[in-house]
Amino acid sequence: MQNEIKKVCVIGSGVMGSGIAALIANSSHKVVLLDIIAKDSDDPNKIVKTAKENLHKQKPPPLSFPDKVNFITIGNLEHDLELIRDCDLVIEVIVEKLEIKHQLYNKIIPYLKEDAIIASNTSTLPLKRLKENLPDNIKSRFVITHFFNPPRYMELLELIIDSMVKFEVIERVSGFLTKTLGKTIVKCNDTPGFIANRVGCFLLELVARKAISQKLDFVALDKIFTICLGLPSTGIFGLYDLIGHDVMKLISSSLLAALPANDAYHKIYVNTPVLDKMIEKKLIGRKGEGGFYRLSVSNGKKIKEVININDLSYSSVQKVDISFNNLDELLVSDSVYGKIFTEIITEFYVYLASLVPSVTDNIYDIDAAMKLGYSWKYGPFELLTIAAKDGWNSVIKNADLMHIPLPQYLGNKEYQKIDKQKFNSHKDILQESQIVLENDSAKLINYRENFIFVITTKMNCLNHNVFYLLQEAASKAEKDGKNLYIYPQGNNFSAGADLKLLLSYIEDGNFHDLENLLKLGQQTMLHLKYSGVHIISCAKGVALGGGCELLLYSSYIVANQELNAGLVELGVGLIPGWGGVTEMFVRSKGDKTKLIRNVRNIIEQNKTSSADYFKSDYDVESMHVNMNKHYILDEALKLNLSKKIVPIPHKITLPKINLATEIDTSKYNDLQNKVLSKFQNIIDKHPDTNEEELLGYEREIFLELAKDPKTIEKLKAIVK
């Protein structure tokens, strides 16, 4: 693509800046990371060098694979400005002080390519202020790209532009942020706090200050907001602690300074001395000595405690029972918490109404910002379709929402998000397709003359009917000379076997049918492996157990970077039974080092934290890693694969090796040692073998483990 962004410079190597640099490196793009000179060291790059080194230490890890750090070149703002010259995008991530930002812009402008885009990661300063006194040719390619922390894991990105920004600049930067970095963009008007923090912090401050003034139970309120409104398990007060009371004060102070006096944020931000007192005593949340909650240790056990706002003492969190189980019940409840919730939610929607269209004219962007930036299950406007219409009547009336085109959505269970990202959603694909084959667990569809296999079970779990239809689909694809694409519904590729089905066989002592299920799965995997056409798996989310085996037997994988995949069956007392053990032995190719690694994958339940790790740890050769999970099918369909060279079954020679001496088993439990012994037995007694024999040994071990009472206990614990 012409003018494609190939190299990026990030200025500012703090947690956010280095995190953005790591994200870019994860996409295998070159990135320059610059910062000021260290005044207390002979090494001018000490600050940025330390930041780069810390990328290997942070939790959760910013890098998808250790080697990705090699895409990052470091330097300082005195000696290394020349490194900017060939960068297509420069992202500024420095202190939130306008004067310092302006000084930086003036310093780097002489080094910019004539079509380089400048972006600020500010979360508080207006775009119009950032652009003050800049040349027009810079203003036309200057935007705000507000990443959320941590950049690798938070999908939301707020993009702020104005009328001066050229259309081609918007297209270039948007394409890079979505397709290359995997972000979902919400376009915001140039208003204080943009969308997510303006809405999210308003609700946090509203609830916290009202709860303190009315002496409400924090634990009860958190439970209400989690169960009834779909907030994450942190609730309101846990999230306040997670962000940090000191940070919340900075954000709110910044917003209040920028917002007009008639904005409702001023009204709800009532003086609450106890919050200031908590900050004084370093009770600022998780990074301090406590917050609204804290964790203490008693007799080696962690205990969650909640603060007593009167004297700032703590007591253990007690279980609270609320009298409603969903939003419908809450909105019509006459209880104290029902009334206070209605009061809060009305005030919240009054504020939301005031933001349309000044902050955004698209209510779907508000929903996306809260779901992706604050991890809400539903966006606030989407919630209007979740609860019964009658429950919202008073809220809508009091909040004056009628000037927003909402009534058509009330009670509409088919609430449809307006999709501006130009990718094909699962729903779109199904709507545009014709069903070729179908049963109660899967379907084969024809999508734009391509065969797509879709599993329709919960979490895409595997069972008989999935395997039957998959074999039929592969045969159909082979007959028609078309590749077969396995594409997941929902957010995950496959959670593996249907454990309820396995448990029912084991509890009934029906090991004959269990073995037949193992054989069916193994036959299906071999069918895929030796098919005359490519079997291309589009993997995202989790691919565990049988889901991982399905990937290993595909001829090509297009995987989202955040894929979590692995052979984890030992966690329920079993081993991979649909060819996973066999394929790990086959992929060792007689090499001792590979065999040790592959055996450990199974015994240590190696669930990889990224597609890069899966490719390395599981010896996957034919894989394309993609940063945006929404584009995996699009990218798979664009693959220009040569005709498949069908592998030929061959003799497998296992190396002479003593696994117990080559692997550190000091932390292994009895089950792990037992399985290791079983694998050693195969190596010792069957050094020259083949796939069919290995599959037989695999079934034999699986069935023996299935008869262990401890396996039943583990399965029951998970299936509950």
UniProtKB/Swiss-Prot annotation:
Entry's Gene Ontology BP terms: catabolic process; fatty acid metabolic process
GO molecular function: 3-hydroxyacyl-CoA dehydrogenase activity; delta(3)-delta(2)-enoyl-CoA isomerase activity; enoyl-CoA hydratase activity; NAD+ binding
UniProt feature coiled coil, ranges: none
CDD domains linked to this entry: crotonase-like
Catalytic activity: a (3S)-3-hydroxyacyl-CoA + NAD(+) = a 3-oxoacyl-CoA + NADH + H(+); a (3S)-3-hydroxyacyl-CoA = a (2E)-enoyl-CoA + H2O; a 4-saturated-(3S)-3-hydroxyacyl-CoA = a (3E)-enoyl-CoA + H2O; a (3Z)-enoyl-CoA = a 4-saturated (2E)-enoyl-CoA
Region (3-hydroxyacyl-CoA dehydrogenase) residue spans: 1-384
Domain of life: Bacteria
One Pfam family, short name: 3HCDH_N
Name of the protein in question: Putative fatty acid oxidation complex trifunctional enzyme
